Structure formats: C-alpha cells, structure tokens
A protein has these predicted regions:
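Non-transmembrane catalytic domains and loops of membrane-associated enzymes and transporters
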Residues: 81-285
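N-terminal membrane-anchoring/stem segments of glycan-assembly enzymes
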Residues: 1-83
Length: 285
C-alpha cells in the first residue's frame, strides 16, 4: 500500500512538472495583445483568453480530483490458496516469435496454485515461427499449457474469443504475448472478484525497458498516470472505463453472454479491428 501511495504522489509530481515545462515552452508562442481601439479584435482575444482559462481550470480540477480519489484507493486483500477460484490465462499471439515463450514462462512462474491455473496459448494465424515457440512452451511444461492454432489471422479480438470459448475457469486473465507478468500479478487481479458485483479488473501495465532511452521514459510516465492515478481513481468510485488489453481479468459468467456481439462488432459497416478492450469493458458496464 505504501508503494502505491508513493507511486501516486511521484506520478502526480511528474505530471505537474511536465505540464509546467510544456507551458513554459509554449508561452512565447502565444501573445494576447488587447487593443481596445479595435472592438472586434479585443472581443475575440478576450473570448480566447476566457476559454483558455476555463480549459486550464477544468484540467486542474480534473487532475486534483483524480489525484485525491487515487490517493484513497485501496487494494483488495488477497485470498488464501483454498479460497482462490480457478483461473484461465489466455495469451493471444500473432507474429511474436520467440518472445511468446518469455510470456508463457512468466505465467508459469506465477505463485497462483497450479491446480487452479489453466494456460491457453492461441496462435492467431502467424506467418512466422510463433506457433513453433508456443509448442516449445507446451513441451517445456507438459500438461500445463493448452494450445490453439488458428490457421487464418482473424485479429486479437477473434483470438481472445476462441480462448474465452474453451476456457474452463471462473476467471479469465488476458496477457499480451509481448508482455511478462510478475509472479503475484494473477493473485492481485483475481482478488477484487471476491465481490460479486465485480465483472472485470484492470491490470497495472508498466514499461520494462524504461531506462533504455527517452521514449520508454515518456511511455512509463504516461502509463504511470494512466494506471497509478486514472484507473485507481476510477476504481475508487467503482467504474473503470477501460481494462487494458495487455493485462486484464474478467468474470467469465459476465462476459460469455456478450461475446458474440463483441466479436462481431462493426464500425461504419466494417469489422472493428481495434479497441477490443474498451469495447468489452463498456459492454460489461
């Protein structure tokens, strides 16, 4: 809990500092020179100033409210092994190559009880050697990993759909094939499902190579704000608006009635190729 509080404060300070730096950089490019001898121009400038002030004030209030809610967020205590439900971990993979094995190994290193953990690896019609690496993972952990080979690439939504259909657990956890989870991640994700009204839980996504350059650091700051603050604040009020595709958990009894509509979702008459995480979250809500 102390670590969460520290991360929340750290993320907030970084966001404030970043906003101040950006404002300082942009300030010279904005000049509001009010010439009251030109009524029309002065009215436009005044309107822009008022709108800008209102937008800045609204952003500040949003940030402060989010920070307060996130500060008071508390993680759900984890259960004893005997109380844990059966969990199905679904790993969809497309042209991920060797890294899918890293993902599978990280799942296998979980401290979740092995007799309550089902791993399903789905090859989404990859054109490289991803399927070979999935099979290698299954051979490395005999009887522990179920494999599904889709001959045609149908997209992540279709791969997850097929995994959900054969999952036998009470809870389904989705993990991207370019990610690695910590050993305690599944237990932490499953804990909130002790409350029957919970239909989905968002994982906490971080950048593993944030020390290797400027871009990873920027991504880490964005992820920190998104997960340590925004989603914590949303969880505090009981309504997370998007469970991230890289790591999330779902109550299968809540999503199974929604799956056909979800997998066949269209946008402007065409099949939806992205946004599967936000779509299923909205359906659950």
């Amino acid at each position: 809990m102390k670590k969460h509080t520290e991360n929340t404060v750290k993320t907030g300070l970084w966001c404030l500092a970043g906003g101040a730096v950006i404002a300082a950089i942009l300030m010279p490019f904005f000049h509001f020179d009010f010439d009251w001898r030109e009524p029309l121009l002065s009215e436009v400038n005044a309107d822009i100033t008022v709108l800008g002030f209102c937008a800045a004030l609204a952003s500040l209030l949003y940030f402060l409210v989010t920070a307060v809610f996130a500060f008071f967020y508390r993680e759900t205590p984890q259960q004893q092994n005997s109380e844990l439900p059966k969990c199905s971990v679904i790993v969809p993979a497309f042209n991920e190559g060797e890294y899918v094995l890293t993902t599978l190994r990280s799942v296998m290193n979980s401290n979740y009880p092995s007799d309550k953990l089902e791993i399903i690896a789905v090859n989404d019609g990859s054109s490289d050697d991803t399927w070979d690496w999935i099979q290698r993972g299954a051979n490395e952990f005999p009887g522990r990993i179920r494999t599904l080979n889709l001959l045609q690439n149908g997209g992540k939504r279709r791969a997850l759909y097929e995994g959900f259909q054969i999952a036998s657990g009470e809870i389904a956890v989705t993990v991207d094939s370019d990610s690695a989870i910590t050993e305690n991640a599944i237990r932490a994700l499953v804990a909130p499902f002790q409350r029957p009204e919970v239909g989905a839980v968002a994982g906490n996504i971080r950048v593993s190579n944030c020390d290797e350059g400027f871009i990873p650091k920027i991504m880490e700051a964005a992820f920190g704000f998104g997960f340590e603050m925004i989603r914590c604040a949303q969880s505090f009020i009981g309504s997370v608006l998007c469970t991230p595709g890289a790591l999330s958990a779902y109550r299968l009894s809540a999503i199974r009635p929604l799956l056909d509509d979800w997998v066949n979702q269209t946008f402007m008459g065409r099949p939806s190729g992205i946004g599967e995480d936000r779509a299923i979250t909205s359906m659950i809500l």
